[in-house]
Design a protein with these regions (language model features):
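Conserved short alpha-helical segments that host acidic/polar catalytic motifs at enzyme active sites
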Residues: 1-169
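A short, hydrophobic C-terminal helix/tail in secreted or cell-surface proteins
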Residues: 170-174
């Protein structure tokens, strides 16, 4: 069967920028990238900007140009911000509500994290139930919120995000 037998189905778009030199308006760059990626997701969108460790963001239902008015985009533009991430969404899991828009920003005892995710967790419901039994309170219904809780839980247990990443992403040698 040819590759063209199945219709195209776009599922979200994710963008990230790190401007080491500090010469770019990372919020504007994220906006432009999301505008270009908008064909991959027209339900919701969002941008999170890291300004010297302080993460602020905006996300909502709607098209990029509707969600990011000049005033909203201006509030994210910081001359000292060097990082931003953005997301446009078509729901592949979870419902079409503002709480499922990304990036999700999580504040916890050791810092703040913004997370964008494209895809589905095959065991999301099982993980969600386990986390709820441990006290997690979910505000939306997306897999991304499950990932946020898992990363945060392990960050608090292990001390650094680098340790979490290394521990959980390192494949065993055979």
């Amino acid at each position: 069967m040819s590759d063209f037998a199945y219709p195209l189905h776009e599922e979200c778009g994710v963008f990230g920028i790190y401007d080491r030199a500090g010469t770019e308006d990372v919020a504007a760059a994220a906006y432009s990238a999301l505008y270009a990626l908008q064909h991959r997701g027209q339900e919701s969108c969002g941008i999170a900007v890291n300004d010297d460790g302080v993460i602020n963001g905006h996300r909502d239902l709607g098209l990029v140009n509707e969600v990011f008015t000049p005033a909203v985009l201006g509030s994210l533009a910081k001359p000292t911000a060097h990082m931003a991430t953005g997301h446009v969404r078509y729901a592949t899991s979870g419902s079409r509500i503002r709480a499922n828009a990304q990036p999700m920003i999580v504040r916890h005892g050791r810092g703040t994290m913004a997370l964008c995710h494209n895809g589905n967790l095959t065991n999301a419901l099982e993980l969600r139930r386990q986390l709820e039994n441990e006290g997690a309170i979910f505000h939306g219904s997306s897999d991304t919120e499950v990932i946020c809780y898992l990363v945060t839980r392990n960050r608090l247990r292990m001390g650094s995000i680098e340790t979490v990443s290394y521990t959980h992403l390192t494949l065993p040698t055979i």
